[in-house]
């Protein structure tokens, strides 16, 4: 480094500047290279036309291999193999019951059950298995604070058990809550993290395919069949094991039904009633075998509307319906009790 400093000090340009009184050149010539600061040394190099060697550096890039993230049993699904749905859906409209004897309504918790999961049930037709990671039933009141009556929610993790028909049976359920009609209440249902097969038919073992059974009980109201609130189901469900799409339309006659349960048929003499299990938009096609085999279908219920196109000669009826709540009906009167009818129901 001293040889470098001496060479720069002896440079003709530096010597000339020193003779002219340049402070940097004078300092370098009289006091030496070591007396200069870093910036002064750089300036002296520039004055002498000295170009330092260019050093090339190749940055080191460490190679890292990230292992696949470890997932837990309760983690969300993986793209291409499963799908996670987190949603809140309308379960039912709650109606009051008079007197001290309670009324009961129940639902089996299964992803393809349209009555419980109106929207999820359509997606579930593409999968074989499911796992519930969070489940809550919410009661939302729609009555005044002066309304009398009680609303109770219960859950049984064994869907094969007979639903309760008494207060004693209801309060024997493993999980239940109760509230005044004008007060909101949540039933948080414990989940077990198990992966279950999705129910394909009524003959499947409920202990293996169904998550459990929800129960609603009402009593003590001043008026019967008055709307007091709504039930919502909030869930996170992982659908897995993709499969071919199951049937998405329901076909039935007076006795046998195939496909998802959108409507529940019941026969009373010459009358066929189709009870819609959930709110939504539906296309219902009714066909007979002889001319004038049935009359024009009629809509029954405060929450149903739509158009009915009817031809008696064929005979056929095409009904485009909107239901605002579950339990609305389509009534068909046959000209003969033995007259068979075919019904096909589509979700719109």
From Swiss-Prot:
The keyword RNA-binding applies. GO terms for cellular component: T=3 icosahedral viral capsid. Residues 64-84 have a biased composition (Polar residues). PROSITE patterns: ICOSAH_VIR_COAT_S. Binds Ca(2+). Ca(2+) probably promotes virus assembly and stabilizes the virus particle. Keywords: Calcium, Capsid protein, RNA-binding, T=3 icosahedral capsid protein, Virion. Its cofactor is Ca(2+). It comes from the Viruses. It is found in: Virion. Pfam families: Carmo_coat_C, Viral_coat. Residues 82-239 are annotated as: S domain, virion shell. Signal peptide: none annotated. Residues 240-348 are annotated as: P domain, projecting. Residues 58-84 are annotated as: Disordered. SUPFAM superfamilies: Positive stranded ssRNA viruses (SSF88633). GO terms for molecular function: RNA binding; structural molecule activity. InterPro entries: Capsid_prot_S-dom_vir, Coat_prot_C_Carmovir, Viral_coat. Homodimer. Homomultimer. Capsid protein self-assembles to form an icosahedral capsid with a T=3 symmetry, about 32-35 nm in diameter, and consisting of 180 capsid proteins. Also acts as a suppressor of RNA-mediated gene silencing, also known as post-transcriptional gene silencing (PTGS), a mechanism of plant viral defense that limits the accumulation of viral RNAs. Belongs to the icosahedral plant coat protein family. This is Capsid protein. It comes from Carnation mottle virus (isolate China/Shanghai) (CarMV).
């Amino acid at each position: 480094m001293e040889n470098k400093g001496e060479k720069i000090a002896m440079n003709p340009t530096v010597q000339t500047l020193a003779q002219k009184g340049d402070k940097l050149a004078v300092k370098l010539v009289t006091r030496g290279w070591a007396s200069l600061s870093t910036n002064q040394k750089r300036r002296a190099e520039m004055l002498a036309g000295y170009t330092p060697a260019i050093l090339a550096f190749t940055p080191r890039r460490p190679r890292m291999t990230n292992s696949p993230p470890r997932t837990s049993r309760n983690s969300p699904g993986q793209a291409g193999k499963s799908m996670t749905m987190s949603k809140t859906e309308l379960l039912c409209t709650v109606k009051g019951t008079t007197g001290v004897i309670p009324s009961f309504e129940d639902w089996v918790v299964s992803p393809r059950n349209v009555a419980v999961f109106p929207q999820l049930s359509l997606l579930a037709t593409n999968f074989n298995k499911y796992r519930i990671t969070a489940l809550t039933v919410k009661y939302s009141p729609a009555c005044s604070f002066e309304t009398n009556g009680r609303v109770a929610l219960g859950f049984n993790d064994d869907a094969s058990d007979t639903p309760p028909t008494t207060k004693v049976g209801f309060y024997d359920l493993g999980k239940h809550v109760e509230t005044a009609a004008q007060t909101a209440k949540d039933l948080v249902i414990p989940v077990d993290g198990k992966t279950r097969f999705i129910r394909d038919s009524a003959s499947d073992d409920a202990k293996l395919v169904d998550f459990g059974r929800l129960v609603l009980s009402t009593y003590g109201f001043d008026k019967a069949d008055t709307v007091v609130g709504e039930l919502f189901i909030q869930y996170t469900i992982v659908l897995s094991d993709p499969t071919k799409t199951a049937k998405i339309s329901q076909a039935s006659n007076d006795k046998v039904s195939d496909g998802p349960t959108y409507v529940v048929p019941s026969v009373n003499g010459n009358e066929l009633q189709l009870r819609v299990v959930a709110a939504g938009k539906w296309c219902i096609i009714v066909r007979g075998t002889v001319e004038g085999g049935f009359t024009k279908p009629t809509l029954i219920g405060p929450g149903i509307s739509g158009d009915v196109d009817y031809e008696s000669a064929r005979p056929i009826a095409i009904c485009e319906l909107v239901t605002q709540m579950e339990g609305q009906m389509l009534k068909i009167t046959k000209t003969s009790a033995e007259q068979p009818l075919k019904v096909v129901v589509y979700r719109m």
